[in-house]
UniProtKB/Swiss-Prot annotation:
<protein>
    <recommendedName>
        <fullName>Putative lipoprotein LppB</fullName>
    </recommendedName>
</protein>
<comment type="similarity">
    <text>Belongs to the mycobacteriales LppA/LppB family.</text>
</comment>
<feature type="lipid moiety-binding region" description="S-diacylglycerol cysteine">
    <location>
        <position position="33"/>
    </location>
</feature>
<keyword id="KW-0472">Membrane</keyword>
<keyword id="KW-0732">Signal</keyword>
<keyword id="KW-1003">Cell membrane</keyword>
<keyword id="KW-0564">Palmitate</keyword>
<dbReference type="InterPro" id="IPR032018">
    <property type="entry name" value="LppA/LppB/LprP"/>
</dbReference>
<dbReference type="GO" id="GO:0005576">
    <property type="term" value="C:extracellular region"/>
</dbReference>
<feature type="signal peptide">
    <location>
        <begin position="1"/>
        <end position="32"/>
    </location>
</feature>
<keyword id="KW-0449">Lipoprotein</keyword>
<dbReference type="Pfam" id="PF16708">
    <property type="entry name" value="LppA"/>
</dbReference>
<dbReference type="GO" id="GO:0005886">
    <property type="term" value="C:plasma membrane"/>
</dbReference>
<feature type="lipid moiety-binding region" description="N-palmitoyl cysteine">
    <location>
        <position position="33"/>
    </location>
</feature>
């Protein structure tokens, strides 16, 4: 079954913004690969180095738990924005591709997707775009909540009526408030081990994932 891959962290930032904001067409931006394909095989790490890296990450908890925490933070931000800006509403993106990206997350730099991923909060769609002043209010709320994760490096690529963007990064996290045709909030976390990897004993590499056949099995 064709499904979106985790978003590569090497994708230029403006492309990631478009991919997340225009979530319905984002499979075209990353190639529409299957989850069975894995472009990040960590060729620069030896097996022992991978084991050491994996074990050093165990204290952080699981990818799945981190994803839930980020989604809770996204809801806090969205609720605060709606309360601060009269008439503004929000909802979690319920598009099937948006849900796929939420489940799959983004690729880590040094570990493959069957070992660890960067969690993504459920994407937030706001009910209307922001005026210049309202965007400042929303960005300030994002700034305050991001700071709780130690995320403080701010930047902006666009600041005009057609396109607005506020981005804050740090500690492996990224919070992005942006609007092109509609306004969205996207949060990506640091690299976390999958729960199935945490469940394995320390000091060893997880088993290689199964290789799925490329052709379907005929039905009797």
């Amino acid at each position: 079954m064709i499904a979106p891959q985790p978003i590569p962290r090497t994708l230029p930032r403006w492309q990631r913004i478009v991919a997340l904001t225009m979530i319905g067409i984002s499979t075209a931006l990353i190639g529409g690969c299957t989850m069975g394909q894995n472009p990040d095989k960590s060729p620069h790490l030896t097996g022992e180095q991978k084991i050491q890296l994996i074990d050093s990450m165990r204290h952080k908890g699981s990818y799945e738990a981190a994803r839930e925490r980020l989604t809770a933070t996204a809801q806090i931000i969205a609720d605060r924005v709606s309360a601060a800006i009269p008439g503004q509403t929000w909802k979690f993106n319920d598009d099937s591709y948006g849900q796929d990206f939420y489940r799959n997350g983004s690729l880590c730099k040094e570990l493959s997707a069957d070992i660890a991923r960067r969690p993504m909060a459920k994407p937030v769609d706001f009910g209307s775009t922001f005026s210049a002043e309202d965007f400042k209010i929303a960005a300030n709320i994002v700034r305050e909540e991001a700071a709780k994760y130690g995320v403080t490096t701010e930047s902006s690529l666009f600041n005009e009526s057609a396109k607005r963007d506020y981005d804050v990064q740090g500690n492996g996290y990224e919070f992005n408030l942006g609007q092109i045709k509609f306004a969205t909030l996207n949060i990506t976390g640091d690299c976390f081990l999958l729960q199935k990897v945490l469940d394995l004993p320390a000091g060893q590499l997880p088993p290689e994932p199964p290789i799925w056949p490329t052709t379907s099995t005929p039905t009797p």
